[in-house]
């Protein structure tokens, strides 16, 4: 593939507006992210592609018809106390809001559009920052996720690429994606996440390794609060080096949730965009077709800072430290700079424990045939 192929950036005004209005957990986040990327002049370094909207049939590649039909129904009629609603995981952390089905179809369609660009050889890197909703199950919404666009993207890529690697750097375990592929050896899932009693979703211990034919094809890296860039990168590189050699992927899907960044209301990890960027750079040097998704990130200016920095890294641009004037400029006070400073929180990741986890993972990967 020609190196001159520009990265693809999935975007349309309608898509951003839908994400802004329906994502009640992160209102206007999609606009903030896009505006900062645009303000730094990064759009001209990419090919902007308008996303399609996923059909019910396309979403049913993973989700059950009954779940999708119920989501469609409550999206139009509102929640009429239907007992099925709770069974489908709707309510609580996945509130029913008007237009939720259209939003799910838009995010799913955007990730499918990105995957199709990669499959057609039109680019080597395709980005859908409003995507990455990794908790949704086949017939159940979960953890703010109504549709698992990451799974849909992987399934689409599998139509062309025999082995697809999924790497999840969100603060939370990528349980929905792991579950979807836990029985196959064609998709390896790697998740680095906080693992602590009572912390959602409560899965993803190092001993969770997949089932049946997929045994040893689920890789979990359970981490504790306070981890910073250097240690995170050492762990990430150590795991991905082994994974790449063992699995030999043909395409990669990366979920880069920004709830690991210092200042996030989750108050857990203590990362900066540079730390995540180093991990991203490591994956990109494989020169494989790579689909990039967002995910969590509840400190909205820091999420925009993070994904803008990562976008610049992808296109090979160094950004000025000063936030450029744009629609959301006032949100970046009091210092109005791109950098995020780690807090003074202690790192709870004991070096010996981390080494034990890495040894465990290496042992599991040796079992991969």
Curated annotation (Swiss-Prot):
Q: Which residues cross the membrane?
A: none
Does the keyword field hold Transcription? Answer: yes
Region entry Histone deacetylase, spans? 5-316
Give the CC-aspect GO terms: chromosome; cytoplasm; nucleus
| Keywords per UniProt | Chromatin regulator, Chromosome, Cytoplasm, Hydrolase, Metal-binding, Nucleus, Repressor, Transcription, Transcription regulation
CDD domains listed in its UniProt record: HDAC8
Q: Could you confirm whether the keyword Nucleus appears in this record? A: yes
Q: What is the reaction catalyzed? A: N(6)-acetyl-L-lysyl-[histone] + H2O = L-lysyl-[histone] + acetate; N(6)-acetyl-L-lysyl-[protein] + H2O = L-lysyl-[protein] + acetate; N(6)-(2E)-butenoyl-L-lysyl-[protein] + H2O = (2E)-2-butenoate + L-lysyl-[protein]
Regulation of its function = Its activity is inhibited by trichostatin A (TSA) and butyrate, 2 well known histone deacetylase inhibitors.
Its annotated compartments are: Nucleus; Chromosome; Cytoplasm
Which Enzyme Commission numbers does its entry carry? Answer: 3.5.1.98, 3.5.1.-
Q: Name one GO molecular function term.
A: metal ion binding
Q: Which InterPro entries match?
A: HDAC_PDAC (IPR050284), His_deacetylse (IPR000286), His_deacetylse_1 (IPR003084), His_deacetylse_dom (IPR023801), His_deacetylse_dom_sf (IPR037138), Ureohydrolase_dom_sf (IPR023696)
A Pfam match: Hist_deacetyl
Sequence positions that bind a divalent metal cation: 170, 172, 259
Protein function: Histone deacetylase that catalyzes the deacetylation of lysine residues on the N-terminal part of the core histones (H2A, H2B, H3 and H4). Histone deacetylation gives a tag for epigenetic repression and plays an important role in transcriptional regulation, cell cycle progression and developmental events. Histone deacetylases act via the formation of large multiprotein complexes. Also involved in the deacetylation of non-histone proteins.
Q: Which family does it belong to?
A: Belongs to the histone deacetylase family. HD type 1 subfamily.
Protein known as: Histone deacetylase 8
Gene name, Swiss-Prot/TrEMBL: hdac8
């Amino acid at each position: 593939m020609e190196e001159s192929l520009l990265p693809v950036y999935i975007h349309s005004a309608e898509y951003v507006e839908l994400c802004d209005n329906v994502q009640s957990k992160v209102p206007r986040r999609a606009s903030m992210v896009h505006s900062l990327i645009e303000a730094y002049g990064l759009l001209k370094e990419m090919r902007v592609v308008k996303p399609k909207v996923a059909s019910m049939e396309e979403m049913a590649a993973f989700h059950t018809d009954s779940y999708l039909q119920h989501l469609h129904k409550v999206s139009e009629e509102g929640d009429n106390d239907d007992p099925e609603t709770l069974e489908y995981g709707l309510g609580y952390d996945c509130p029913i809001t008007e237009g939720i089905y259209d939003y799910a179809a838009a995010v799913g369609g955007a990730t499918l559009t990105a995957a199709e660009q990669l499959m057609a050889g039109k680019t080597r890197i395709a980005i859908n920052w409003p995507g990455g909703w990794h908790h949704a199950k086949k017939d159940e919404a979960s953890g703010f996720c109504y549709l698992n666009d990451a799974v849909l993207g992987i399934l689409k890529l599998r139509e062309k690429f025999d082995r697809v690697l999924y790497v999840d750097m969100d603060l939370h375990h990528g349980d929905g994606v792991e579950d979807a592929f836990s029985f196959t050896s064609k998709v390896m899932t790697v998740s680095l996440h906080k693992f602590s009693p009572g912390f959602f979703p409560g899965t993803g211990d190092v001993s969770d390794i997949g089932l049946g034919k997929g045994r040893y094809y689920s890789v979990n890296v359970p981490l504790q609060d306070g981890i910073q860039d250097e240690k995170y990168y050492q762990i990430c590189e150590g795991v991905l080096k082994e994974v790449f050699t063992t699995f030999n992927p043909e395409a990669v899907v990366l979920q880069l949730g920004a709830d690991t960044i210092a200042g996030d209301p989750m108050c857990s990890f203590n990362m900066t965009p540079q730390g995540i960027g180093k991990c991203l750079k490591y994956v990109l040097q494989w020169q494989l077709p790579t689909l990039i998704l967002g995910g969590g990130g509840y400190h909205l200016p820091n999420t925009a800072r993070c994904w803008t920095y990562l976008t610049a890294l992808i296109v090979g641009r160094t950004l000025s430290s000063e936030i450029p004037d744009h629609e959301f400029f006032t949100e970046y006070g009091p210092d109005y700079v791109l950098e995020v400073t780690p807090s003074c929180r202690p790192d709870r990741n004991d070096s010996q424990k981390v080494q034990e986890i890495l040894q465990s993972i290496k042992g599991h990967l040796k079992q991969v045939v």
